Amino acid sequence: MVTSVKVRAPSSTANLGPGFDVFGLALDAFHDEITLTKKPWRGVRILTADDIPKDPQQNTAGLVIKSMKQKFKIKSGIEMRIKKGVPAGFGMGSSAASAAAAALACNRLFNLKLDNKSLVKCAGIGEKASAGTIHYDNVAASLLGGFVVVKTKPFDVIRLEPPKDLVLCVAIPKLKVPKKKTKVSRAVIPKTVKLSDLTENLSNAANIVSGFLLKDSDLIGRSIQDVIVEPARKHLIPGFSRVKNNALNAGALGVTISGAGPSVIAFCKKSQNVKKVAKSMEKGFSSAKIDCETIICKPSIGPKIRV
């Protein structure tokens, strides 16, 4: 009988420009690790050396486990060890990686036999702890790997395999980010938009999906354009415009804010000089007197489970 399960789930980037709350892409840059162990008592206990809430109600992964315990009438106590590898608050899907790993581990530990859609819905509940609302783009990417498209009414999630030549460069500025940063960054998004802006974003979003279907990195890159959310959020990231322009001038196919920011992500191909793109992004942040770390990574195939 299985008494303990360990899951390692990848970081992710959401939105990809025009796909706000709809698109997600798993990245092999960072990982979170969750270990669930059955215990004789009834509650949920979190053990971690990281600076995150230990109250399950305030913790992304804890919220997922509490919800699944209630929904599936799990009587066993659960000890959860959390090892954070995804930097929190930088638009890399940190909360989602923990939520995804927790949902997958719980499914395996208690043999729930949930399908992918059900797992994504369970993991999405955890986002309420960090973002204040339930959304599924990052958790779907961390759970399923690859590129994901989320539909909410009715709920559905589609996974597509990324092109093999797609490479990402993520610039992570060394900024002090507020707690509940995702909630703060969502507050600046306009409540109403012009029809022409909506049309432009829809066109770009459709072309991004087409690019993943056709395995065309160039089409994906030139469609990474957002005229609604990015303009509203870019003022929260010092030096963003310079970072973006520098990366494009260095050969990046497309550049946008990674998730809710403040990280900036450039889409490239393996055949390009991606290190040149990375250096150009560092110089962009440097012009705003901001240090940054650049990570060159590729799409992740998804989480790993160990029993």
Range-by-range predicted roles:
Residues 1-90, 104, 108-114, 145, ...:
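ATP-binding N-lobe of GHMP and related small-molecule kinases
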Residues 59-71, 205, 243-245, 280-281:
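Short, well-ordered amphipathic alpha-helical segments that serve as non-catalytic structural scaffolds
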Residues 75-154:
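Gly/Ser-rich oxyanion-binding loop with an adjacent helix/lid
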Residues 165-245, 249-250:
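Acyltransferase
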